[in-house]
């Protein structure tokens, strides 16, 4: 029984938050057809429905599956021929047993309709507060069994919400949530702009930019422990665009301390600052590759805004983008084979995907003003901010080009998303 995994889930304190509404935009007609049955229960029926509901929604949000429900609980001996006739390929069923006031036994099975075999089976002990978390974990396991790669459901998002308070005042919030926008938490509130939140590799810290002292400074917030916010030293001029090294010990920063915007590496323990670019042009928006041996950044050194890659071992810098006059805000895919970026098409700014080896650039969206792309941990999806009407929302597109779901707030704008690594 995997008690350790689940008895300590979701224990951080909620302050206040912006509720995001999730809208599934598209489903591919070729998506994998699967049925997620409500769990049979002994005790509390509602919790069994929650687990099935979360798994079902996760799969539909992925763009890879068409997950449906039934209005009854499927027992452990389903009629496979019936489901085969309905062109269902797999069935998820489970059982939930209440063993104390707030603790449950959870059992789950994934069945192949055609072979009639059990593809995955497991059981857990879970605290009431960990019900949604275990559903995300199980979604990842099922996704892996069916598609051969891990899902990105047991992860978190960070983003900035902006609310108009009237009389020209705005409230900025640094917020986090589960990958499906549930369990939202407000980490920081400010009347001054907050920008560029980015999760640390261990998911315990968030670096961001704040103007609370009437200048741009980089801070590190600890959302899950009672620890004082860490402010990086003040560097003359602008400090912006923080990005973590995979080892969690260094941050990339854009600084103008020498009069020109360049990329620097800042070592947190020694406070050592290393300059990585020296061009007379503006260099900004840098991020590391998954191994930390390369950085990608935006520069106007060619006379246009383009994306460049620097090899930190050889110090060689190569231009990565040649299509179009504007490419910016690039990030590496988890396998380092692709870059997601903002690409201008006419007067519109859209999310594009660049194959680094072939230089093939694919336009992924059809919006007017997209910004801040970031990959899911498994590389199958890209989250970004986009304008919708007079507001800003978060949207997700799969790397296959399907815009799968959207996160919006009735209270104001949502912008600058960042997707965490896998939770531990």
Swiss-Prot record:
Keywords: Cell cycle, Cell division, Periplasm, Signal. The Tol-Pal system is composed of five core proteins: the inner membrane proteins TolA, TolQ and TolR, the periplasmic protein TolB and the outer membrane protein Pal. They form a network linking the inner and outer membranes and the peptidoglycan layer. Part of the Tol-Pal system, which plays a role in outer membrane invagination during cell division and is important for maintaining outer membrane integrity. Residues 1-16 form the signal peptide. Belongs to the TolB family. It comes from the Bacteria. It is found in: Periplasm. The keyword Cell cycle applies. InterPro entries: 6-blade_b-propeller_TolB-like (IPR011042), PD40 (IPR011659), Tol-Pal_TolB (IPR014167), TolB_N (IPR007195). It holds the Pfam family TolB_N. One of its GO terms (biological process) is cell division. This is Tol-Pal system protein TolB. The keyword Repeat does not apply. GO terms for cellular component: periplasmic space.
